From Swiss-Prot:
Protein name: Carbamoyl phosphate synthase large chain
Function of the molecule: Large subunit of the glutamine-dependent carbamoyl phosphate synthetase (CPSase). CPSase catalyzes the formation of carbamoyl phosphate from the ammonia moiety of glutamine, carbonate, and phosphate donated by ATP, constituting the first step of 2 biosynthetic pathways, one leading to arginine and/or urea and the other to pyrimidine nucleotides.
Residues annotated as binding Mn(2+) 4: 832, 834
InterPro entries assigned to the protein according to its UniProt record, in alphabetical order: ATP-grasp, ATP_grasp_subdomain_1, CarbamoylP_synth_lsu, CarbamoylP_synth_lsu_oligo, CarbamoylP_synth_lsu_oligo_sf, CbamoylP_synth_lsu-like_ATP-bd, CbamoylP_synth_lsu_CPSase_dom, MGS-like_dom
Pfam (any one): CPSase_L_D3
Keywords: Amino-acid biosynthesis, Arginine biosynthesis, ATP-binding, Ligase, Magnesium, Manganese, Metal-binding, Nucleotide-binding, Pyrimidine biosynthesis, Repeat
Boundaries of every MGS-like domain copy: 930-1058
PANTHER family, A to Z: CARBAMOYL-PHOSPHATE SYNTHASE [AMMONIA], MITOCHONDRIAL (PTHR11405:SF53), CARBAMOYLTRANSFERASE FAMILY MEMBER (PTHR11405)
Oligomeric and partner information: Composed of two chains; the small (or glutamine) chain promotes the hydrolysis of glutamine to ammonia, which is used by the large (or ammonia) chain to synthesize carbamoyl phosphate. Tetramer of heterodimers (alpha,beta)4.
Membership in a protein family: Belongs to the CarB family.
Protein's organism: Streptococcus pneumoniae (strain P1031)
Pathway assigned in UniProt: Amino-acid biosynthesis; L-arginine biosynthesis; carbamoyl phosphate from bicarbonate: step 1/1; Pyrimidine metabolism; UMP biosynthesis via de novo pathway; (S)-dihydroorotate from bicarbonate: step 1/3
GO molecular function list: ATP binding; carbamoyl-phosphate synthase (ammonia) activity; carbamoyl-phosphate synthase (glutamine-hydrolyzing) activity; metal ion binding
Amino acid sequence: MPKRTDIQKIMVIGSGPIIIGQAAEFDYAGTQACLSLKEEGYEVVLVNSNPATIMTDKEIADKVYIEPITLEFVTRILRKERPDALLPTLGGQTGLNMAMELSKNGILDELSVELLGTKLSAIDQAEDRDLFKQLMEELEQPIPESEIVNTVEEAVAFAATIGYPVIVRPAFTLGGTGGGMCANEKELREITENGLKLSPVTQCLIERSIAGFKEIEYEVMRDSADNALVVCNMENFDPVGIHTGDSIVFAPAQTMSDYENQMLRDASLSIIRALKIEGGCNVQLALDPNSFKYYVIEVNPRVSRSSALASKATGYPIAKLAAKIAVGLTLDEVINPVTGSTYAMFEPALDYVVAKIPRFPFDKFEKGERRLGTQMKATGEVMAIGRNIEESLLKACRSLEIGVHHNEIPELAAVSDDALIEKVVKAQDDRLFYVSEAIRRGYTPEEIAELTKIDIFYLDKLLHIFEIEQELGAHPQDLEVLKTAKLNGFSDRKIAELWGTTDDKVRQLRLENKIVPVYKMVDTCAAEFDSETPYFYSTYGWENESIRSDKESVLVLGSGPIRIGQGVEFDYATVHSVKAIQAAGYEAIIMNSNPETVSTDFSVSDKLYFEPLTFEDVMNVIDLEQPKGVIVQFGGQTAINLAEPLAKAGVTILGTQVADLDRAEDRDLFEQALKELDIPQPPGQTATNEEEAALAARKIGFPVLVRPSYVLGGRAMEIVENEEDLRSYMRTAVKASPDHPVLVDSYIVGQECEVDAISDGKDVLIPGIMEHIERAGVHSGDSMAVYPPQTLSQKVQETIADYTKRLAIGLHCLGMMNIQFVIKDEKVYVIEVNPRASRTVPFLSKVTNIPMAQVATKLILGQSLSELGYQNGLYPESTRVHIKAPVFSFTKLAKVDSLLGPEMKSTGEVMGSDATLEKALYKAFEASYLHLPTFGNVVFTIADDAKEEALNLARRFQNIGYGILATEGTAAFFASHGLQAQPVGKIGDDDKDIPSFVRKGRIQAIINTVGTKRTADEDGEQIRRSAIEHGVPLFTALDTANAMLKVLESRSFVTEAI
């Protein structure tokens, strides 16, 4: 059926900020879909609150609204734009929930807007646990025995009839939020109570646990003519019981017989047909390893994390085709863009193995609960492609960037057998490494399979890796063993370690004997048809399919997996850099390992290498492609860390040179540079051990800010107020050494702001200054940033511009740089300089209309700012106010403290823009799901040093009609200054403490600050946790609370007697 002509204008809903469970895969899907609809001639309107995405660029849709994805704002845009149809299936759970809400509130009927892709009834059937159960029974598809409950007591009663363990799944939540596995009644009560609160319909499904079954996923497509096909099946390494987003996954599935595959394939196709989904859909099934029994676990009636993985694993562009199907085209009418000759009705065939490993945030959250279960915890993932399981698994391990280059963590050798086996059985994020260690200790695959229910097939592969390690150890410099190791994905570094030599020597030996990788094409059809995709992976074999072109090329390094501190913002910069390289007439080559992102979409660059970002893997591509040079400044710390080894190997680094990158990163060189440029910085010193640190701090005076050099996202950074805390930090938080000194700086409590600048070596363009709402001490990635600045004097702004120019020229910056300043008493100090693109590039690019990464790339390739039409200095500021606000994923991470400090904790961001500061703030808070009603109670629990300031906030809250509650000390302080607050207990006062008030819904906001001694704050942590679990707005910085107050004051009415 040809495409529909009765609709002209389509609105697409994006997925909003990045949180755990909903990451960059939706930027990829949304970008694909918008371009796909425009290609068919429709007018596209996009709504998304996340500025750090490619999809919110002006050229992706005809009209782009960066506004909160809430009923209030989406309705406004619908009424203004009057689209004919709405496509919600590309915005993740956010998009689906928004569509449901618009429908329930009658907005879609009122404006006669049609839903495309998935009908509401299908969303309901797939998402509502009761309707799903009915549908499966009608289709005679088996599902685990289960019961829908609305109260904790109902849950306990049902569990008693089927027996433990049981699984709790809240309805309409994302990434398993609030769910979990319960082994007994105590756990069941706890998890159900929390799950009911987090479910928007206060409903949970309690089901029999089928933990230990194989977890298999099918990614299916269907069109309006009822053509349906399987794009790809995937098998989890971890059995059922661990969220698929936290599991290691292989595609295609490896351990099923043909009969089992056909059985599950038929089930998946019958489900998508019954739901009448037009587009993509993901079906998760559990297969009993010992019989042909299977259960349907769940269905996602939308494009998901797994579809991004399936798209990248097969090359089959699911989101692009889902958008075309949504407007009436059928699979037998659309050409598969990969081959350019076959139709999309072909099921992809793979002649390789893909491995996906999740990336977890526990390097940032040392206290976080690492046990894996049905609630997702990973922030991102890596994917690797190889010709066998060993190769793809080991390539994925070294893509993770957790300091490993093989499936082993050396420290585990010291773990006792008992502790090892406990970790093997009770899965945490690093289970793969524990299982590998167990095999190295001689546990057999059979024994481990019995303990873990991991298929013996995979454990045999881990055993094979260990056997090759032993071969290598026994035969140093043996070329045959070297070839075997390379065929199985071993890195030069691992081989060097086993041979007692250096990586360089192994590389030399390989090159001399022509043991080099070949690059194979990902073509969706196992080389059956000719293909034109420039999408490659490396393997050791024969016939290289990646042919170097005659055009001069530039290699751009991506930023790897998404993690806290290095998010989708860097992918945004990478994609823009590629556009500029192409515009300058070069061939653009991308190298990256993240399957969720736009940069790994093969249609973005001229060539895509899906490879780990390590020195060895990058050099292999450089040896083949011989590019003009490599651009490292857009790939975050990942790419910057590769600059030095690459330069040593004779590779041309384009943009700021390695020596100058060093001057910004190395403390002593940086101080030297600032002295020469006559720019003040807070007094500080470096220390290589505990005594030196204590001495430095005495000299500078407390409080001090301590941190390791060379890190991103403020890892292991702390503000310490006394020597005792400092010594404990030096002992536990860092491994200080002469090679890795610790920086000790005077901590200045002032106004913080930051600048992104672009330099061509002579002139410096400063697109804008962003002022932070939270004062210094909260990581810049967790602060709310305002552009243009609201409180900085003209003089301070001029000083900032002057220092920025001096630094850019003095440090020989070519391209992008980011500088952070702190201002106290009108004096400007430089805190740090990053000679690369930073996480504020997308936000600032959007609000100033300067495509910063593109401009920077053109300068790197030799153009000047004046040639591009930009003037030197600070760019004229916008008349509107724009705010970038952080978004956190604390609900997903048990035991992680939500207190903000110098170590970054946010996973994503939103933007609010309007004519005034208050309106922009309102939008930013709404978009980041911090909604405060206009009346209610606010509770204060405040450290001594901030009580004075909190008193003023409390008075203002009272003036707009809020009730004030406070803990004992705070209430006494308020009372002594004439403000009566209702006292509440901290913790343990049964019905009168803060958590119980929170549970009863009597508190609308919590303002909690922490004093200088952070250790004694367990009560505070429990209070903060209760706020997170019940969705009560929590402010741990008074500046954020003050910003929220401004919003409330601007919306409140004055009530006065005449």
